[in-house]
Amino acid sequence: MEISTRTKQLKAIFSYDKKVILEDQPLEIRPYHFIQNMGVNEIEQFQQLLPTNEFCSIPDNNIQENKSFSYTIFTPKGSRKTNQAILLLHGLNERNWDKYLTWAEYLSLATGKAVILFPIAFHMNRTPGNWYNPRALMPWVARRKQEVEHLNNSTFVNVALSYRLSDTPLRFYISGKESMFNLWQLFREIKT
């Protein structure tokens, strides 16, 4: 099957809310909820120092979508516990898991291991909804193109990240540290 066709099929059934059993493969996609608790005080101390801006008037430490969110695991059908898993992270500016779904499916089928799709801080489903709404973001894209000379490739996909990091580059470090704490917590939760 062509990869673009399979990507569309997986995208159509992917859910953060309910378990999906792949009818044509011996796999299922299970959603799990994550509530950040490891490193919270340290991260909040940093985040409280960050200024808000016109793009986002909510302080980083008050963005609830970043603290409590869902992640998914591709796993062989019916398996309960495995000794090994593959952690699949994403790149910057990613808004959805679409292109990673076929990768996760392939890795799980080829290895027999669970594949965890875990979002890094302030990406994917860890952001307010208006950060990935094209209609809401297009005025910001136009504004960004006016503010930054020779900027030709600004799109709604990267405008949230661009505004937030240009305004306060320290956000990149703090988000990385927050993601590290989240992964540490995830690994501890998986082991118990």
Predicted features along the sequence, with ranges:
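Alpha/beta-hydrolase active-site loop
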Residues: P134-K191
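N-terminal cap/lid segment of alpha/beta-hydrolase-fold proteins
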Residues: I3-T5, A12-K81
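Charged, low-complexity, helix/coiled-coil-prone segments
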Residues: I43-E54, L117-H123, T127, L161
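Short, surface-exposed "cap/lid" segments of acyl-processing enzymes
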Residues: S70-Q146
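Generic low-polarity alpha-helical segments
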Residues: C56-N62, I116-H123, G176, I190
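Short, charged/polar micro-motifs that form catalytic or ligand-binding hotspots
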Residues: N61, L87-L101, S166-G176
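Repeat-unit-sized solenoid/scaffold elements
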Residues: M1, K191-T192
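Alpha-helical context
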Residues: E65, N83-Q84, G91, D98, ...
